């Protein structure tokens, strides 16, 4: 399965029991290289991804400044070192899951809930971790 298929079929899929889906999603290498992304994933800066990677190494580094992606600032509401970062901006937010080699991004807006976004992103992340990725 191609990385683009993972984004299209597992991240941008319809959420069970609803007609809703994430606003944008992507799979990036921990070096910031894009493996696959949805058409509307924000154009990000390399230093924004570097800051996310640093947060996974040292949880709490993004708390004072927020998580920035494509110029949008998300307030970090939860961060587990080496695992997951969750952020909020108004009625929407972001979830980033780290695997051994990748960062999985999911961005949502209402009516999608934080829990639905977390479930989609983390389910794929856990699967990739099981596959050694």
UniProtKB/Swiss-Prot annotation:
Database matches in InterPro entries: PFN (IPR048278), PFN_euk (IPR005455), PFN_sf (IPR036140), Profilin_CS (IPR027310)
MF terms in GO: actin monomer binding
KW Cytoplasm (keyword) present: yes
Alphabetized SMART domains for the sequence: PROF
Keywords on record: Actin-binding, Allergen, Cytoplasm, Cytoskeleton, Disulfide bond
Record localization: Cytoplasm, Cytoskeleton
PROSITE patterns linked: PROFILIN
Cystine residue pairs: 95-117
Transmembrane segments: none
Tissues/organs with expression: Expressed in pollen (at protein and mRNA level).
Predominant place of localization: cytoplasm
A Pfam family that the UniProt record links to this protein: Profilin
GO cellular component entries: cell cortex; cytoskeleton
Subunit structure: Occurs in many kinds of cells as a complex with monomeric actin in a 1:1 ratio.
Function: Binds to actin and affects the structure of the cytoskeleton. At high concentrations, profilin prevents the polymerization of actin, whereas it enhances it at low concentrations.
Family designation: Belongs to the profilin family.
Protein name in UniProt: Profilin Sal k 4.0301
Organism, as annotated: Kali turgidum (Prickly saltwort)
